[in-house]
């Protein structure tokens, strides 16, 4: 996890801190718009009206990946939790089950992303809402002009307040008029976010969850949501803002819930206790999405049996580097057709 002191230290740098081996660069999150390498977007047309039923009464057909090519986004960090760039194809080894796979494609380019923001508007967010809104704004500043976004807010139930759009201003404008109230239907909001992402136009997809607690008002269970995100080819990131001194029961369970859900997808969960750190963490997540490796392989097992197949990415880093950590999705469901 990235704690407040580390974030402050990272944010004070003006650029990148070079690792003196083989040109490997740990990428640090920045605060100001001048520090972001992507230029601001041009205003786009207003989004269309949402067409997903907010009641989402029934499960939809599980997502399946094309068994002929599996794409695995990978994030690498150093012991100080900084992003590590500059690695090559030969530094990665990928396994499906016990069988090593041949890497067919390898990229570290900044590709457009379809992004959904899941924003907690429950009553307990009342004193933190302005910082949380600022965090969303900072996250958007790391986007590139081709990205598309949608936003879901949730309290007693989730609500899609902005359909897919490239207009950051439109989403920010809608967020201003939301009022914190009610309980926390986090799991239902994740369900709606994953369902909505089926309309995404880009192969790379990500959800960002901003919440101050666990769940206390959802119809879907934790097990159902974990099964769903395993079926979806979506990176999930989360920022959990918790009171470590007087936590509620939901807050005590919240960090583990977010960590478990994000880990399945190759994303990460960040836990903080100071609302002032929200903007720094959201910027870090945005930059991380721009500095990932994407590995593609064709499974040696061609059987279309619909079964869960475990994935493991291992590193063979250049000599002299400290221990590095790998974040990647844990597997995928093979198709049946």
What are these regions (language model features)?
Residues 1-10:
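N-terminal secretory signal peptides that target proteins for export/translocation
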Residues 29-337:
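Scaffold/interface architecture of coatomer-like assemblies
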